[in-house]
Design a protein with these regions (language model features):
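Beta1/beta-strand and adjacent pyrophosphate-binding region of the FAD-binding site
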Residues: 2-17, 41
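Conserved Rossmann-like nucleotide-cofactor binding loop
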Residues: 17, 48, 217
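Short, well-ordered alpha-helices that flank and scaffold nucleotide-derived cofactor binding pockets
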Residues: 23, 27, 31, 164, ...
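Glycine-rich FAD pyrophosphate-binding loop
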Residues: 26-53
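Dinucleotide-binding Rossmann-like beta1-alpha1 core, especially the glycine-rich loop
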Residues: 57-136, 145
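Helical element adjacent to the flavin cofactor pocket in flavoenzyme catalytic cores
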Residues: 149-209, 213-220
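Glycine-rich beta-alpha-beta "Rossmann" dinucleotide-binding loop(s) and their flanking helix/strand
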Residues: 220-229
């Protein structure tokens, strides 16, 4: 693949943030008749899913206390479900099995799930919880359980394979992915602080916009961009 000299969008990071952005942006450009993924380049200093995206737990759930997070995760679950094969996603559901001290908080999570129409079941009481679990696991023996929140949707994904699947979807829309390419700095407009290019160890890519999806490496880019501490 020839090294690109100019594109509209440079995305830094080939993990879930960068590749998801590339895929959705390419799809949006195509839908609006403004081009396709050929306007987008993703660069990464290492390889696809080489960072946190490749080693996270892989759990897909909607079990969060913040209402805004719950609505966001409901949409995310829909994305996972949209192409389970390529995302290496297993829709086995998710369960929170809790002692009495957590029951009221879990009950609130359940109530908010119901408010947004998220498919889940909430079992309360020691005996009912035990019976519910034994219907699925005949050898269930855990003690001190007073509630079970069973999310019928959700599950888990095989991390690295899922990210490669995401890369395939982005590339299918024309996105170019350059791995083993390290960002060394940025170019700025002569009359403004706008970024006009991304400097790498393989050359400079002129661009209109830069999206940094580098996860825990964001600090180094923050410094390169001379943003306030």
């Amino acid at each position: 693949m020839a090294f690109p000299e100019k594109v509209d969008y440079v995305i830094v990071g080939a993990g879930i943030h960068g590749l998801s952005t590339a895929w959705h942006l390419a799809a949006k450009l195509k839908a609006k008749g403004k081009g396709d993924g050929s306007k987008i380049v993703v660069i990464d200093k290492d390889s696809i899913a080489a960072g946190a995206s490749g080693i996270a737990c892989g759990v897909v759930r909607n079990n969060y206390y913040q209402p805004a997070m719950r609505e966001l995760m409901a949409m995310c679950v829909e994305v996972w479900e949209s192409d389970a094969k390529n995302f290496h996603y297993h829709d086995v559901g998710y369960m929170q099995i809790s002692p009495e001290c957590m029951e009221s908080d879990v009950a609130e999570i359940y109530a908010q799930q119901k408010n947004i129409g998220y498919d889940s079941v909430f079992i309360q009481g020691k005996k009912d919880s035990e019976n519910y679990m034994k219907k699925m696991f005949g050898d269930w023996q855990a003690q001190g359980i007073t509630s079970v929140l069973h999310e019928k949707r959700g599950g888990y994904a095989n991390n690295t394979s899922a990210i490669y699947g995401l890369a395939d979807k982005a590339e299918a829309l024309g996105v170019k992915i350059l791995t083993g390419t390290t960002v060394t700095g940025f170019e700025f407009g002569s009359n403004s602080n706008a970024v006009t290019g991304v400097q790498t160890d393989k050359g400079t890519i002129k661009c209109e916009q830069v999206i940094v999806g580098a996860g825990p490496w964001i600090k180094s880019f923050w410094d390169m961009l001379e943003l306030p501490n």
